[in-house]
Amino acid sequence: MILNYIEKGCGRPLILLHGNGNSSRYFKKQVRYFSAKFRVIAVDTRGHGKSPRGEGPFTMERFADDLKIFMEEMGIEKADILGFSDGANIALIFALRWPERVGRLVLCGANLSPDGLRFLPRLSFKLRYRLAKDICKDPKKTELADLAANQPRIDEKWLSRLRMPVLVLAGTFDI
């Protein structure tokens, strides 16, 4: 699968991963800013932006697999990775599976499981997913809602395996 991406600058690779339903364009200002010191690569994940959907179900693990293949195809052995929302979940799963490929990790609004969301947003995601699933019988049309309602599933104990510098950002009013 060939993922679409925006690339600017040179130097140490910095990969930016957007959230559910967004695209690399989400990071337009960050690409411009960080490209003064980094080789910035903002990726459209599978089925987002201009990247094809591909086959099989959407899972955070599949997105992490896609990132590994993308890095190999781009000739990137190791990169700093910044993820926002579901992009942070993908970055975290990637770092847990291939820690040697991550220099530094920045997680903005990540969650270990859907249970990490506040009650009302979690309920909203679950209800929208169930409603979409009942109305639309095509699983490909409900998969973004499924990501929000049912993923990721990261065991808190796994976090102790991270050895790279990690910056976690979360806001008081995050969902």
How would you describe each model-predicted region?
Residues 15, 41-43, 84, 108, ...:
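The conserved SAM/SAH-binding core of class I Rossmann-like methyltransferase domains
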Residues 89-97, 103-131:
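Flexible "cap/lid" loop of the alpha/beta hydrolase fold
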Residues 162, 168-170:
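Short beta-strand/loop motif that positions the catalytic acidic residue
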